[in-house]
């Protein structure tokens, strides 16, 4: 069993964990950053999800470090991929959901580049494929976090720990009180909170499907199990069949048509979609 003694231990290597590591290393602290997957970067890398940003991100509403990250993503395309585009608001993937859609490997490259100087000076240690499995406490104080990686246990001791995991993995391990879902008005005093708390009111998990259209081909497979059920299934809150080109508007909940190909009249290529694309692209 190995061991690490550092000023700050960050468990979870998503964007938040990386940002915390950079801030601490810039202050001269010794830091260890652990990540349970093969890559740091969290949703932007391992899950392939573009940054979910507000419409004014190009003008205001971002930290200096996040602005630097965004610039480096765009610069990577110009420098490495030889993209000839002087637009400061370059959207490499030309996606709808973000003004900076890009290949997950680019974020991985950018984050590793930002962290490398501190790794070379010995201020930072990064452990991937490292999962927290046990927490040792003395009273209310966390004394050590045990990480499992490749069948080996590593103990990490630090005066300060940051839980930057996707789902708060250290909370149950450390037996720290926590809640899930949506709190009630009585819990928080928020006027728009639920009347009663709902522990299951959380953001849904998303499974991404990669699809390719090949004109003229026929690629229909035999009907899988429960095909008929899912073909015809319509949830109570849905305006049409779940697997169709109709879905509720995210704000008004009105029925909205979608289009698969450019030139269609449904979202995102129809009139309202075109306006949204223009808004997101600045």
Q: For the regions a protein language model found, what residue spans apply to each?
A:
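Beta1/beta-strand and adjacent pyrophosphate-binding region of the FAD-binding site
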Residues: 2-14
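Flavin (FAD/FMN)-binding glycine-rich loop and adjacent Rossmann-like elements that form
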Residues: 45, 128-129, 139-141, 149-160, ...
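Conserved N-terminal/central alpha/beta ligand/cofactor-binding core
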Residues: 29-30, 35-130, 134, 203-206
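N-terminal Rossmann-fold NAD(P) dinucleotide-binding loop
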Residues: 17
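Loop/turn elements at helix/coil->beta-strand transitions in domains of secreted/extracellular proteins
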Residues: 5-7, 27-30, 121-124, 154, ...
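Aromatic pocket-lining residues of Rossmann-like dinucleotide-binding sites
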Residues: 24
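Residue-level recognition of alpha-helix boundary/capping or hinge positions
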Residues: 2-4, 30, 137-140, 146
């Amino acid at each position: 069993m190995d061991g690490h003694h550092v000023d700050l231990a960050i468990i979870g290597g998503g964007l938040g964990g990386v940002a915390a590591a950079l801030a601490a290393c810039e202050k001269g602290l010794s830091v260890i950053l652990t990540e349970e997957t093969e890559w740091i970067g969290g949703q932007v890398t391992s899950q392939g999800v573009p940054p979910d940003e507000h419409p004014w991100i190009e003008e205001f509403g971002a930290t200096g470090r996040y602005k630097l990250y965004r610039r480096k993503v765009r610069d990577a395309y110009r420098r490495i991929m030889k993209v000839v585009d002087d637009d400061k608001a370059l959207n490499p993937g030309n996606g709808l959901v973000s003004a900076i859609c890009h290949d997950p490997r680019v974020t991985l490259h950018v984050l590793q580049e930002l962290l490398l100087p501190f790794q070379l000076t010995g201020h930072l240690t990064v452990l991937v494929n490292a999962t927290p499995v046990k927490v040792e406490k003395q009273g209310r104080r966390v004394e050590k976090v045990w990480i499992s990686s490749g069948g080996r246990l590593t103990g990490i001791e630090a005066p300060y720990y940051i839980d930057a995991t996707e789902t708060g993995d250290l909370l149950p391990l450390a037996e720290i009180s926590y809640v899930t879902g949506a709190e009630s008005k009585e819990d928080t005093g928020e006027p728009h909170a639920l009347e009663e708390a709902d522990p299951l009111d959380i953001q849904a998990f998303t499974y991404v499907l990669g699809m390719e259209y090949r004109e003229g081909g026929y690629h229909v497979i035999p009907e899988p199990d429960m095909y008929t059920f899912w073909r015809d299934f319509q949830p109570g809150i849905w305006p049409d069949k779940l697997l169709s080109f109709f879905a509720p508007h995210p704000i008004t909940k009105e029925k909205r048509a979608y289009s698969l190909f450019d030139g269609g009249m449904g979202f995102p290529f129809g009139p309202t979609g075109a306006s949204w694309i223009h808004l997101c692209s600045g």
